[in-house]
Amino acid sequence: MKSFLSSCTTGGCGAKIGPGELSKVLSGLPVFQDPQLLVGFDASDDAAVYQINEDTAIVSTVDFFTPMVEDPRTFGRIAAANALSDVYAMGGSPLFALNLVCYPEREDIQDLGEILAGGAEKLQEAGAVLCGGHSIYDREPKYGLAVTGRLNPRQIWKNNTPQPGDRLILTKPLGVGIVMAALRGEMAEAAAVEAALASMQRLNKYAAEKARDFPIHACTDITGFGLLAHTREMAGGSTTIVLYPSALPYIAQAYTYAQGYLLTAAGQRNRNFMEGAVEFGDTPFPLQELMLDPQTSGGLLLSVPGDCAQEALRAIQETEPQAALIGEVLPRQDFPILLG
């Protein structure tokens, strides 16, 4: 059987359409109005939120992509963790999911079974129910989930509502996209691959559960657009976010790979999108690339009031030891993002 990696031109969230191109396409769609639709696609948030009654809202999201690893079950776990993440990023809890499958007709069907088994493992860990799905034949394997969850409509974690004085917490290390590019090029060290796989398979459930004990002003998960583009979305039009590159958690080998100009196409699309929104100044090139690197099943970026940020960080580090304070929120300046 032809390997997963050799059969796919790209993998994971690095396969996402770039943020600039996607914005142009979505701008031509009608904006649907419904008083119960609390978060729609026009908000560029992580999931849709639809209110059912005073105390309950449904959160709905979908995510799928091509493999970035050879092992089918590992791929299934990563894809499921990534799809579930959007529910956690909104402050919700997943209820049920549907499989989304594209699979080559000539590939071993047992490998598809392994993919689905890996996804089911993560759904069980999340406490969600698998209810069915849809499958088609395709030239490249693709897998993901449509996930439905619930939350209190008064406690939605939107991605663009930080407040001046907030501090930013990132719950997972950066660099998985660069490491996966090195793996595809057969240049990745075993320790780097192990760290990246562990991060991508880790549910954001545990960080979200710790964060719920604190007032969260804004939240998003870091995926294919990279830290900088997701931070740009969080800043919106009314605040500026200062990031501290020296405080960023990252997979150590990813810095070395970036230093050797082992880059990703998606990272360069992200760089183009950020032109005019950030000045890198004397920030070392490898750190620039880590901030632009497309993450698959990346961590949560939480905007927390400054007076409880350290306490929140300590709580989150009980389950996510690499979590770090990486920035702060200011009133609007000349740029949406500054590097400190």
UniProtKB/Swiss-Prot annotation:
<feature type="binding site">
    <location>
        <begin position="133"/>
        <end position="135"/>
    </location>
    <ligand>
        <name>ATP</name>
    </ligand>
</feature>
<dbReference type="GO" id="GO:0005737">
    <property type="term" value="C:cytoplasm"/>
</dbReference>
<keyword id="KW-0808">Transferase</keyword>
<keyword id="KW-0067">ATP-binding</keyword>
<dbReference type="InterPro" id="IPR036921">
    <property type="entry name" value="PurM-like_N_sf"/>
</dbReference>
<dbReference type="InterPro" id="IPR023061">
    <property type="entry name" value="SelD_I"/>
</dbReference>
<dbReference type="GO" id="GO:0005524">
    <property type="term" value="F:ATP binding"/>
</dbReference>
<feature type="binding site" description="in other chain">
    <location>
        <position position="16"/>
    </location>
    <ligand>
        <name>ATP</name>
    </ligand>
</feature>
<keyword id="KW-0479">Metal-binding</keyword>
<comment type="subunit">
    <text>Homodimer.</text>
</comment>
<keyword id="KW-0418">Kinase</keyword>
<feature type="binding site" description="in other chain">
    <location>
        <position position="86"/>
    </location>
    <ligand>
        <name>ATP</name>
    </ligand>
</feature>
<keyword id="KW-0460">Magnesium</keyword>
<feature type="binding site" description="in other chain">
    <location>
        <begin position="43"/>
        <end position="45"/>
    </location>
    <ligand>
        <name>ATP</name>
    </ligand>
</feature>
<dbReference type="Pfam" id="PF00586">
    <property type="entry name" value="AIRS"/>
</dbReference>
<comment type="similarity">
    <text>Belongs to the selenophosphate synthase 1 family. Class I subfamily.</text>
</comment>
<dbReference type="GO" id="GO:0004756">
    <property type="term" value="F:selenide, water dikinase activity"/>
</dbReference>
<keyword id="KW-0547">Nucleotide-binding</keyword>
<feature type="site" description="Important for catalytic activity">
    <location>
        <position position="16"/>
    </location>
</feature>
<dbReference type="GO" id="GO:0000287">
    <property type="term" value="F:magnesium ion binding"/>
</dbReference>
<keyword id="KW-0711">Selenium</keyword>
<feature type="binding site">
    <location>
        <position position="86"/>
    </location>
    <ligand>
        <name>Mg(2+)</name>
    </ligand>
</feature>
<feature type="binding site" description="in other chain">
    <location>
        <position position="63"/>
    </location>
    <ligand>
        <name>ATP</name>
    </ligand>
</feature>
<feature type="active site">
    <location>
        <position position="13"/>
    </location>
</feature>
<dbReference type="Pfam" id="PF02769">
    <property type="entry name" value="AIRS_C"/>
</dbReference>
<dbReference type="InterPro" id="IPR036676">
    <property type="entry name" value="PurM-like_C_sf"/>
</dbReference>
<dbReference type="InterPro" id="IPR010918">
    <property type="entry name" value="PurM-like_C_dom"/>
</dbReference>
<dbReference type="InterPro" id="IPR016188">
    <property type="entry name" value="PurM-like_N"/>
</dbReference>
<feature type="binding site">
    <location>
        <position position="46"/>
    </location>
    <ligand>
        <name>Mg(2+)</name>
    </ligand>
</feature>
<dbReference type="GO" id="GO:0016260">
    <property type="term" value="P:selenocysteine biosynthetic process"/>
</dbReference>
<comment type="function">
    <text>Synthesizes selenophosphate from selenide and ATP.</text>
</comment>
<protein>
    <recommendedName>
        <fullName>Selenide, water dikinase</fullName>
        <ecNumber>2.7.9.3</ecNumber>
    </recommendedName>
</protein>
<dbReference type="InterPro" id="IPR004536">
    <property type="entry name" value="SPS/SelD"/>
</dbReference>
<feature type="binding site">
    <location>
        <position position="221"/>
    </location>
    <ligand>
        <name>Mg(2+)</name>
    </ligand>
</feature>
